[in-house]
Amino acid sequence: MVENTKKKKVEEIERCPECGSTNLIRDYEHGELVCGECGAVIEDAYIDQGPEWRAFDSEQNESRARAGSPMTYTIHDKGLSTDISWKNKDSYGRSIPTRNRAQLYRLRKWQKRIKVSNAAERNLSQALQELERMASNLSIPDDVKETAAVIYRKAVKQNMIRGRSIEGVVAGALYAACRITNVPRTLGEIASVTRVKKKEIGRTYRIMSRYLKLNIMPSKAEDYISRFCSKLKLSMDTRNKALEILRSAENAGLTSGKGPTGVAAAAIYIASLMTGERRTQRAVAEVAGVTEVTIRNRYKELTEKLQLNVEQ
């Protein structure tokens, strides 16, 4: 109910809460609702709520309504099972007699046990609950959760779970899904909602991508600009300047072999100095999940190679 209310509120947003502009950009690729004037990321879990079906004639158009929830990989039984209602009412809405409620209670209990009747199903159920928790804390869109669930299921089939914690494998699958769907989340952000160290998540992710042959393109520094700038409360001018610096750096071959978050952080830091919206290296480093040393190194490379006139 809370989730439905949240989605409704997102759909009803007409003005930017920061500057009041009505120029809102709905970026479905990255799951973000961005202000076109000041660059604020108003919502970072924005997804298209419209139907995914297509109709080619009037008959198909009439038959598009669903009789239930669609199949999903984020539930261990793919959402295909049914539950006995806890409302203690029959199909006509009449209350169940008191003498029959104990029997109904036992039926519910056994149905719940049967749904996860063996160790493999219990493992999968626990893992997908953990995935839901992580994704909720990071405001991950539903399509990314679906991708992560599919990756985890493949890892189970390949017997990659043995010797590893469920939480670590789920975290690796979620990070891989974010990379595949171009929804930028850093390893540090994933690690912040788990009890698994960032290094272990990275190792699990690399093993998964190799053995499952995941088609993952290298992440780009520009994918992180909008979210980092929004967290730092920087204007659209600073965001555009950071993107301009990044494009110049890419053309000059300065981003090759460098961590995208570090390059993005340095570009934002330089842009904030150039536009007069000064942010400290520490503030930028905390948002980007990198060290101040990384920002200083990237800052020096970019300003020298691109001959940028920046006053610190």
UniProtKB/Swiss-Prot annotation:
Keywords, A to Z?
Metal-binding, Repeat, Transcription, Transcription regulation, Zinc, Zinc-finger
Which cysteines are cross-linked by disulfides?
none
| Annotated residues for binding of Zn(2+) | C16, C19, C35, C38
Task: Tell me which residue ranges form TFIIB-type zinc fingers.
Answer: 12-43
The record's sequence repeats, renumbered to this chain, cover 129-212, 223-304
For this protein, the record's InterPro entries field holds: Cyclin-like_dom, Cyclin-like_sf, TFIIB, TFIIB_arc, TFIIB_CS, TFIIB_cyclin, Znf_TFIIB
Q: Care to name a GO molecular-function term for this sequence?
A: zinc ion binding
Q: Name one GO biological process term.
A: transcription preinitiation complex assembly
Identify one Gene Ontology CC term for this UniProt entry.
transcription preinitiation complex
Query: The organism sits in which domain of life?
Result: Archaea
Which family, according to the similarity comment? Belongs to the TFIIB family.
Function field = Stabilizes TBP binding to an archaeal box-A promoter. Also responsible for recruiting RNA polymerase II to the pre-initiation complex (DNA-TBP-TFIIB).
Spell out the NCBIfam families in the cross-references: PRK00423.1
The name this protein goes by in its record: Transcription initiation factor IIB 1
Q: What organism is recorded for this protein? A: Thermoplasma acidophilum (strain ATCC 25905 / DSM 1728 / JCM 9062 / NBRC 15155 / AMRC-C165)
